Structures are given as structure tokens and as C-alpha cells.
Amino acid sequence: MNSPKDELTALLALNRIDSIGSIRAKYLYEQLGSAQEIFRNRKHLKEIITGVNQKLIDALDDSGAFIKAEEELRFIEDNNIRCLTPEHEDYPSRLRDCEDAPLLLFTLGNADLNTTRIVSVVGTRKATEYGRRMCNRLISELHSICPDVLIVSGLAYGIDAISHKAALDNQCKTVGVLAHGLDMIYPQRNRDMAKRMLQCGGLV
């Protein structure tokens, strides 16, 4: 029987193989039903699934992926990170239907990623004073109309950080989607804000 921990380790290993992108990983997962089954059957994938080549089989033979996965699992456990697969009820339903939806999402915090009202804010890193005012005004007015709105941005310089701060100042839930993972916060100046976001939203 596949234990949840063993399956998570296999998913992390699959995620670590650079030559297997999210679309191909998702396809293999859907065909075989679990990451462990992908690795168990790697020698016979050509017979089981159409479109598999030797390069993919060789990539799955990389034992280094499991070493990295075990290190990553320790970090996940030590930092109380949640790992969501597409089958998990908390996995964002809007993302699940995308062709390149990742097999794993790593989250911290208490945000509901399936809440009805989500507004994503993107903008320049070099915001003008006018841009700052308008961003603050937009989020303040959104909150007054929809108190349960979730503000999503990237926790980067400029409009990202301004939108997160405006959300926190208005008691809005806010989520930062990090390009580099949960093992670091960049820019460093946003670390304190990221900690606040864990109490009123979260990080992905």
C-alpha cells in the first residue's frame, strides 16, 4: 500500500526532475494514478503509455531526485508547509483545470484558495506616487464592497508589496505567490510583511 509520506516523497522527486515539465508530469500521473507507480513502472513506460521516449525513462532513473526529495520533505515537515495535490479539496479549483497545473502546491498560512472572490494585482516595480495612491484606493474600495475578497500578488517590489500592505491595512486576506519557493523571502525588506500575511492570508 502506498503511504501518504512515500507518495509525497515520490511526487517531490518527480517535481525535481528538470526535464519533466508540469504538463508531462501531470499526464504520467493521470495515466498511472500515483507518482510511486510512475517510478515503479519506469522501465516499462514505453509499453504502458504512448509518447514515452528513452530520454524520459532515463530521467526517471535519476536517484539524485529522491535524495533531494527527502531533503525537501524534511524542510516541509520542519516548517509546517502544506502540500496540495490536484485531488486535495483545498487545491485551487480554478487552477486544477489548467493544462499545466502543477502536481504540487506548497502553502503557508490560513487563506482559502477557493474563496469566491479573488482579485490578482500586478504592476510595475517602480510605482509612481499616483500608482501607489490608486492601488491603495482600489483595495480599500474593494474591501468596502466585498469584505471577503482575497488579494493575490507576488510579494515583489513596487505594486506587489503595496497591494499586500493595503490589503493588510484594510483587514483583507492576502496571498503572495512566490516565484522562488517558500525557503526564502525576496526582497528581504518584505519579510516582516510576509509574517503578517501568514496570519491574514498566506504564501504559495
Question: Where in this protein do the model-derived segments appear?
Answer:
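Glycine-biased, small-residue-rich flexible motifs in mid-sequence functional cores and linkers
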Residues: 2-5, 85-204
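Short, small/acidic-rich helices and loops at N termini and domain boundaries
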Residues: 1-89
